[in-house]
Amino acid sequence: MNVFNQKMKLAAKCILLTLFLVCFTGIAQHKKAKFKVIAFYTGKNDQAHISFVHEANKWFPKIAEENHFEYDSTSNWDNLNAKFLANYQVVLFLDTRPETPAQREAFQKHMENGGGFIGFHFSAFALNDSSYPQNWDWYHNTFLGSGEYGSNTWRPTSAVLRVENQDPITKNIPKTFKSQPNEWYRWSNDLTKNPDIKILLAIDESSFPLGTGPKAHEIWHSGYYPVVWTNKKYKMMYVNMGHNDIDYEGKTNKTLSYTFENETQNKVILNALLLFGTKKGK
């Protein structure tokens, strides 16, 4: 009888230990998020930008789970207000920019109060006499520093990118690496002359000629083109990537390339997210 009781007690202890381990593992797996990210997008215009938005809204939740932060996204730009933004540490613009005065004021205050930001590709676009005129001087000239859109390459092609400055964002990034295909932008402002701008990645000369045309101005043969940079006065980064290659010629609108299928490129974005999400102050 004593032997039976001892076995029952041992079995009970094993069950309790198993339950404890299961509970502990569950708690560890669902530990509190380090920070929260909100992505704004429109997703209605260029199919290349729509494709990128869909891809981003699949990739970011995956890396959020792996790195213990939360990711939300919205196409309602009216959510760009102080009350809503108070729930998040980092804001992303996946394709366009805010257009109303209230939205713009809320975003500027978010940044001036130490919030984080990553903008992709078309989010910096501004061109007078277009649907996105340069009518927000703080954003395009002070914050991004780029000014107006100047020109772009065509069609989307890969480039060799070069690290221009050491930074926590470029930590463990090779000096040069090949990017995913992209439509590359040139800007009206010379970012090298802006003391607030820190250029992180630029197109390496080995990339030239860059683009395939058919128009001559869509092929770059020389020049200096920054593609990723920060503004030292804010927790921000602009990334020129964000235009997937699309089968326009075949009229299928099929996605031919994906921005987030590049580990090195992804590492730059993840480094920035983790830095902006956890760093206190500006």
Where are these regions (language model features)?
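A structural signal for well-ordered alpha-helical segments within the folded catalytic domains
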Residues: 54, 58, 101, 105, ...
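Short, solvent-exposed loop/turn segments at secondary-structure junctions
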Residues: 44-45, 79, 98, 124-126, ...
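Extracellular ligand-binding/catalytic regions of CAZymes and related secreted enzymes
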Residues: 30-35, 59-62, 66, 209, ...
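A short, polar/proline- and glycine-enriched secondary-structure boundary/capping micro-motif
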Residues: 130, 181, 248-251
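Bacterial Sec-dependent N-terminal signal peptides
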Residues: 1-32
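Helical hinge/lid and interdomain linker segments adjacent to catalytic or ligand-binding clefts
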Residues: 34-127
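Catalytic beta-strand/loop cores that center a nucleophilic Ser/Cys/Thr
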Residues: 152-238
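A glycine-rich, often tryptophan-bearing local segment used as a flexible ligand/cofactor-contacting loop or short
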Residues: 97-172
